[in-house]
From Swiss-Prot:
Catalytic reactions on record: a ribonucleoside 5'-phosphate + H2O = a ribonucleoside + phosphate
One GO MF term: 5'-nucleotidase activity
Top enzyme class: hydrolase
Protein name: 5'-nucleotidase SurE
Keyword annotations: Cytoplasm, Hydrolase, Metal-binding, Nucleotide-binding
Domain of life: Bacteria
Localization of this protein: Cytoplasm
Named cofactor requirement(s): a divalent metal cation
Enzyme Commission no: 3.1.3.5
UniProt keyword Nucleotide-binding, yes or no: yes
Cofactor binding, note field: Binds 1 divalent metal cation per subunit.
Amino-acid positions noted as binding a divalent metal cation in the UniProt annotation, renumbered to this chain: 8-9, 40, 95
SUPFAM superfamilies, A to Z: SurE-like (SSF64167)
C-alpha cells in the first residue's frame, strides 16, 4: 500500500518514527508529511491567514516532509500538492497520550485522520496512553506500531463505511501485557477542568491546564473504561454532528417559515 503518515507530536516524535519503521518493514511505501513542531490539542484547525511552509528531512533511515502548520494542514497539503497520487491509507500517530471520549474533539491526531476521512480515504488514528503514571517514557513502541499496521492490513475498509475514522488506543503497558482488543463506543464523560495558577517574575498570573475525567462518570464498556482496564480499544468515529433526535423535535416546533 501507499500510506500517508502524519501525527500531531511532530515529525521527530518516536511514535511516528515507530509507525514509519513498521510500515516500511511490512513492505509499504510511506509518505511522511507531519508538523515540524508539537501540535497537540489543535484539533481540526488549519492555517488560513498565513502561508504554509514545509521542508524536506532526510536522515539515514528516514525521509519525510516537515510542515510549519497543523496536522490538518499536513493532510491537506499532502493530498492537494505534495503526493504523486492519492494514498491507499492514511495513518496518524502513534500519539503520546490516549485519545478517547472527549479527547477526540481536541486531538490533532484525530483531526488529521478526520481530514483524510473527509477525502474518502481509509483512515486510522493510533494513540498510546503514555500519560499514565506507570508508563516508562522510553518504552519501545515498535510492538504497538506493528500491531497497528497489521490491523490496518486486516481491516475490511469497504465495510467500515464512508468518511469514518478507525480510532485505536493502546493501554499504558508493554503490548504483551495488554488485554485483548475490544471494539467499543467512546465514553460520553467529560473532563473536569482544573487550572493551576502561578505567578511570573513580575507578579502577573498565568495558568496550567490540568484535570481528569471523573471515574464515576465513565460508562462500563466504553473506550476510557476498557483502556483503563488494560484493553486495546477500537472505536469507529464519524463526524456528522447533526443531532437527528433534536432535528425531529425542532421541526415539530414549527419554527420554520
Amino acid at each position: 500500500m501507499n500510506v500517508l503518515l502524519t501525527n500531531d507530536d511532530g515529525i521527530r516524535a518516536k511514535g511516528l518514527r515507530a509507525l514509519y519503521a513498521a510500515l516500511r518493514e511490512a513492505g509499504h511505501t510511506v509518505y511522511v508529511v507531519a508538523p515540524m513542531s508539537q501540535q497537540s490539542g489543535v484539533g481540526h484547525s488549519l492555517t488560513v491567514f498565513e502561508p504554509v511552509r514545509a521542508t524536506v528531512i532526510e536522515e539515514p533511515d528516514f525521509t519525510g516532509t516537515g510542515v510549519y502548520g497543523t496536522p490538518t494542514d499536513c493532510v491537506k497539503l499532502a493530498l492537494g500538492r505534495l503526493l504523486p497520487h492519492k494514498p491507499d491509507l492514511v495513518m496518524s500517530g502513534i500519539n503520546a497520550g490516549a485519545n478517547v471520549g472527549p479527547d477526540i474533539l481536541y486531538s490533532g491526531t484525530v483531526g488529521a485522520a478526520t481530514e483524510a476521512a473527509h477525502e474518502e480515504l481509509p483512515s486510522m488514528a493510533v494513540s498510546f496512553d503514555s500519560f499514565s503514571h506507570n508508563t516508562a517514557p522510553d518504552m519501545d513502541l515498535m510492538p504497538q506500531a506493528r500491531h497497528a499496521v497489521n490491523l490496518a492490513e486486516r481491516m475490511n475498509w469497504s465495510a467500515v463505511g464512508r468518511r469514518r475514522v478507525i480510532n485505536i488506543n493502546y493501554p499504558a503497558c508493554p503490548l504483551d501485557e495488554a488485554q485483548d482488543l475490544r471494539v467499543c463506543p467512546q465514553t460520553s464523560a467529560v473532563w473536569k477542568n482544573v487550572y493551576i495558577e502561578r505567578e511570573d517574575p513580575r507578579g502577573a498570573p498565568y495558568w496550567w491546564l490540568e484535570g481528569e475525567i471523573p471515574p464515576a462518570s465513565i460508562e462500563p464498556g466504553s473506550d476510557k473504561d476498557l483502556l483503563n482496564r488494560g484493553h486495546i480499544t477500537l472505536t469507529p468515529l464519524c463526524f456528522d454532528f447533526t443531532d437527528h433526535e433534536g432535528l425531529t423535535a425542532l421541526k415539530c416546533m414549527k419554527l420554520q417559515g
